[in-house]
Amino acid sequence: MKKTLQEQIQSNRRASLILASLIVVLLGALGTAITGTYAPDYWWAGTLGSMALGLIVGLVANFSGPSIVLSIAGAREATHAQDQVLDNVVEEMAIAAGLPKPKIYVIQDDTMNAFATGRRPNEGVIAVTTGLLRKLDRDELQGVVAHEMSHIRNDDIRFMTSLALTAGLIPLLADMFVRMQWWGGLGGRRGRDRNSGDLSTIFAVVGLLLSVLAPLFARLLELAVSREREYLADASAAELTRYPEGLARALRKITLDPVPMQSFNRATQTMYIVKPRALKSRWAGLSSTHPEVEERIAALMSLAGSDPERFSRPVPPMPTGAIEAPPVVELPPILD
């Protein structure tokens, strides 16, 4: 049975929160094992301490601004006179989302892509490439802007930044514990009695296992959360535009665009609506921050009650003053 729009949105939110909670649990488990190895009677201090550390890191991430990201991308602030259609579309979607109008930035790049950033929903920023403005029609541009507006409304930027930094603590703690064991021996200092010593050894073994597995699982969970937030932004965009086909067509055009991104940077690649220069492999589904585009398109078209193959229709004529549409072509399927 197909999910309704609200059901899909709620499902994606639940999934992302569950996955994020598992990362916090992994962090707490690793902290417990480390403390239990050296102070078995105070293992609970490791649990509380590691989770408190994660909270502090998350709060620090909350105060990081978007200026560095915009600088890396080479974005410039747009004006209404220079990009009237983009300005109008952003304003429309801000009204639909019930948010203040975000600042608009343009990236001088012939490829098609876009991202959102900002500390909180009322301080949002949307950046798009010049290639996107030239190659998408108004419906498709509206779908892309709605997707980025949804990231702002859903507080995804702050959520994912905090999550990434919290997840990043896990390999740091794991590496620290392995080094401590390497120099101090299995189980560290023994307790005053045999029971404490045995418990310390158990914690040490568990800690070593977690040191190997926890960083891998944390990374996979982080990537899974990112994919869920992309699905959530797609569904929320459909809610804002009431026209899922616009975003679906835009996603396919962006994916099929042969122009490489000149301003490509690995530090910001996960922020874009479609990951630039994404390499496909057997493990692409697990190691990708974004869902497969065909899966996103199918989900969008199911919301519209349409067949996923039907959306690549000719682009209708645009009114005077709108973005000039590219020549009408039949879009081929995306090849693996």
Descriptions of predicted regions:
Residues 25-43, 169-190:
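Juxtamembrane "helix exit" motif at the C-terminal ends of alpha-helical transmembrane segments
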